[in-house]
Amino acid sequence: MPLRLDIKRKLTAMSDRVKSVDLHPTEPWMLASLYNGSVCVWNHETQTLVKTFEVCDLPVRAAKFVARKNWVVTGADDMQIRVFNYNTLERVHMFEAHSDYIRCIAVHPTQPFILTSSDDMLIKLWDWDKKWSCSQVFEGHTHYVMQIVINPKDNNQFASASLDRTIKVWQLGSSSPNFTLEGHEKGVNCIDYYSGGDKPYLISGADDRLVKIWDYQNKTCVQTPEGHAQNVSCATFHPELPIIITGSEDGTVRIWHSSTYRLESTLNYGMERVWCVASLRGSNNVALGYDEGSIIVKLGREEPAMSMDANGKIIWAKHSEVQQANLKAMGDTEIKDGERLPLAVKDMGSCEIYPQTIQHNPNGRFVVVCGDGEYIIYTAMALRNKSFGSAQEFAWAHDSSEYAIRESNSVVKIFKNFKEKKSFKPDFGAESIYGGFLLGVRSVNGLAFYDWENTELIRRIEIQPKHIFWSDSGELVCIATEESFFILKYLSEKVLAAQETHEGVTEDGIEDAFEVLGEIQEIVKTGLWVGDCFIYTSSVNRLNYYVGGEIVTIAHLDRTMYLLGYIPKDNRLYLGDKELNIVSYSLLVSVLEYQTAVMRRDFSMADKVLPTIPKEQRTRVAHFLEKQGFKQQALTVSTDPEHRFELALQLGELKIAYQLAVEAESEQKWKQLAELAISKCQFSLAQECLHHAQDYGGLLLLATASGNASMVNKLAEGAERDGKNNVAFMSYFLQGKLDACLELLIRTGRLPEAAFLARTYLPSQVSRVVKLWRENLSKVNQKAAESLADPTEYENLFPGLKEAFVVEEWVKETHADLWPAKQYPLVTPNEERNVMEEAKRFQPSRATAQQEPDGKPASSPVIMASQTTHKEEKSFQELEDDLDTMELEDIDTTDINLDEDILDD
């Protein structure tokens, strides 16, 4: 079976001919040197050109990143080496390195060295710490030296490829080569070392259209993959995947298996000749340079081959080497969230295939390794081979002794105790299979679930899943697609009933087999169930869990991580990254158990679990209860005063809210509680809350609405004392305390307003106020001050002033005449009264008003809200006079029925 290798193009950068490419080790950058003399830096994540260096007018055949110095080093046909700072774009250094075209640059991984090769047949070593002095010259080739590469397993050794048809291996410090490899019939263009520890191999490509694999210890050619139709211009071992990548002037890039040397894939992007290739350890990205530009492709899946059993034993594959680590061995080591765990790694041996996935069975006794179209089942303890076979895919059942394989796109086989139990062909083929309580088979038509026992169709769903995750109980299942995930409930009782009665069974299976609980628009990368809580990592690098329709974020991850498992006794969740680093995050099992019990409405169990939840986690649980609609329980559980106060308000719990407000001493809380108290008609509590909140406006509203005169009086004094002058003024005004209103305006410097108030209500004070106003205004504008007229000096400008004095006296003497509220219907409204007329009939001897014989209150000046009077009745003579002067047209007849004959007359 072929190697399963996903290939995705990430970047296409059109440009002039590309002579070399390089990838930055930490930034998402690709460096491309061009035949036109420019060097470009592309961001392959944003697909944008981020930097350009105009090097010279001649081809730049070599360019490399020196990340630890923030440099780009270039070599061109003008024989110059140039060093640029890629942050500032400044040229740091420039020197002539060779007497002919510079073909290649190699950067030493640890020392301050670069190696350069040239058409002058020389290789030179340069030390940038010694002002770029030439430390050594390597002579021996008799033609152009096309490429040099440093041995990743021995940094003092490097190899060179030349058009003299040879490959030479050199040692730093020695000017002559260690040995020479010969075998190509034409010039050798490219060379690379195998970075794995298991094989001492070199690869070379030449103008004879051949690729050769060399054992540099035995100095022999071990393989010659054939297939290119033109000169082979580049060749490399991928540092992570078991593949060889070669590029040719025939326009194709060929991918070969590095163990079997089988051709796995051929890429042709139609960009003419291929000139260069670059890959990077720790990344699946590969950069390719063509005549018409450059391309970055992503090969394979970045998810590591890694698995953890329920006891904390982790197995992973590093290339073909299988290693193990045990979380128990950490003992009582303090673990911090998100920090790499200091695990002791144990080598378990080598795997016969290149592992692409590793997965424990449910009880952890066995582990399956899949790759190269094959699977091998090992014992988890000693890595002993238990079973093997060919398969495109493998899936464990919930029963640890049972599993399924997808033999082809049409055949699925089920095994029990390592023996084939059943083979069947799904109706619409099998593109992928999924394990768990039911066997899931994806086809072009959707997803079908089958019974493991008899392969009977349970339900067909029109959905294209990427992953399927079953809970331990088998009641819940998560189906993750490209854009979202669904939470379904498996109704096993209804399935059993339908299988017995054959009711509700259609061609798509049992209709009531599943109940959809929710759909969430988020992409699941990896996931697992703990009880009824689904924990997952998302496409935006968040670690979340879903329970009861609520998504809780556990952590924001700084890189892509993959879930390994959850250890309840540790209360920790474990994840790994593609570099095989293990990290952990705290997640209390008691919290998950409580939430699971609530979701199942098992409140007796929830009450038993609650005491085991630490206090610092209670508020998280309370938020969950609130979202589930159990606010009363949330109020009991929560330990956060803010949250409890909000819940108390929502539930109308005045006592609890009052206690929390006293503890918090927050004006905002007192205002919120006052609103609730008013809505509950608890006016005394509302008054206290408003006092605590110093909400004078609210107190005024409450006092006036309830008709509490003493409260208005106290409020006026308190508001004035605290500088709340508007409220104080209104409180005095509502009580009819005009003198206090006037003095308040004067004290606060509101003299114009005081003058108008005096003119309207207290004419006896107007002269004093105008004098004060004039004195104050003269400090700013003398002319304006002189233009102010005192009403007592210019009575002609203020008509009715004398009458106003009389009214004022009348008001003062009758102001104390207040009437009971029950007489309100008998009182004439202020807008219908004529105070001047009432004051004319006023006699000082009647200052103390008496009840009139008809029971109506005597006349009194109702200028303020606290003053009342009755409607004034006209005398008989006044009515006679009114009738004499009335015209017929003045009579309103809208509500009177008149005889039409009379109207006609």
From Swiss-Prot:
GO cellular component, one term: Golgi membrane
Gene3D superfamilies the record matches: 1.25.40.470, YVTN repeat-like/Quinoprotein amine dehydrogenase (2.130.10.10)
PTM-bearing positions, type Phosphoserine: S859
Oligomer status and interactors: Oligomeric complex that consists of at least the alpha, beta, beta', gamma, delta, epsilon and zeta subunits. Probably interacts with PEX11A. Interacts with JAGN1. Interacts with SCYL1.
An annotated Gene Ontology molecular function: protein kinase C binding
Keyword Metal-binding listed: no
Organism annotation: Rattus norvegicus (Rat)
UniProt function note: The coatomer is a cytosolic protein complex that binds to dilysine motifs and reversibly associates with Golgi non-clathrin-coated vesicles, which further mediate biosynthetic protein transport from the ER, via the Golgi up to the trans Golgi network. Coatomer complex is required for budding from Golgi membranes, and is essential for the retrograde Golgi-to-ER transport of dilysine-tagged proteins.
Compositionally biased tracts (Acidic residues): 878-905
Membrane topology: Peripheral membrane protein
GO annotation, biological process: endoplasmic reticulum to Golgi vesicle-mediated transport; intra-Golgi vesicle-mediated transport; intracellular protein transport; retrograde vesicle-mediated transport, Golgi to endoplasmic reticulum
Region (Disordered): 837-905
Family membership: Belongs to the WD repeat COPB2 family.
Compartment(s) where it occurs, according to its Swiss-Prot or TrEMBL record: Cytoplasm, Cytosol; Golgi apparatus membrane; Cytoplasmic vesicle, COPI-coated vesicle membrane
WD repeat ranges per the UniProt record: 13-52, 55-94, 97-136, 140-180, 183-224, 227-266, 350-388, 390-425, 746-783
Coiled coil: 867-891
Name used for this protein in its record: Coatomer subunit beta'
Sites bearing N6-acetyllysine, chain numbering: K627
Alphabetized UniProt keyword annotations: Acetylation, Coiled coil, Cytoplasm, Cytoplasmic vesicle, ER-Golgi transport, Golgi apparatus, Membrane, Phosphoprotein, Protein transport, Repeat, Transport, WD repeat
Main localization category: cytoplasm
Keyword Magnesium tagged: no
